[in-house]
Amino acid sequence: DERVLQFYRWVMVNKRAPSTPTHADSAPDMPAQASLDQVSFPHVARFDASATGGDRFWEDYAAGERIAHPQGMTIEEAEHQMATRLYQNTARVHFNQLQQSASRHGRRIVYGGHVISVAHALSFDGLENVLGMAAWNGGSHTNPTFAGDTLFAWSDVLERIDIGRDDIGALRLRLVAVKNVDPSREDVALKVAGEDGRERYHANVVLDLDYVALIPKRAAAG
């Protein structure tokens, strides 16, 4: 058998008794970045940039660059429930409004996988010629998303990775999604200091995802 996917997932579970210890110090040690040694990179030949409408290749991106994705997308109740069913997620927090009416939010929460999907779709407007994801290094659903929220996103280029091939390279990207604020019109702080002095994600930030994307090099252009 050949392994095609492996990931570590942390889930939020309500405590029956708030005083129950969390054993936070028992978390296993994990690498900060996924190893690309086991990633199967496709071969790219005669890449037709005219089909994508983009002229930026691996060499044209630089660490420290921020790419704003201009489009926004409003989440609708029916579509996020349909998508969640397709993901085979049956958690009541996403479907049962009668139950959620008594919760602290009073509403159904949009499934985090749908938030990732929307943010990744928005990123295609600005990330030119990216072929797809190779690995996730880590990520956080930082605040809940609800139907009626409008999502925007930006990508920070953390690293340009040369895998030793002439036709393809990789970019380490940080994809951030925010709700109900357009980052092209006003600044959005990623994190803010709380009343207790601890740093927390801004209330409008809903996703912080660190991943590796594949992108052709200029030599592969047809």
Locations of regions flagged by a protein language model:
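A generic structural signal for short, non-catalytic loop/turn and secondary-structure boundary residues
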Residues: 62, 129, 202-204
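Hydrophobic beta-strand-centered segment that forms part of the acyl-chain substrate-binding groove
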Residues: 104-105, 110, 115-160
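Catalytic strand-loop segment that frames the active site of acyl-thioester-processing enzymes
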Residues: 16-18, 29-110, 217
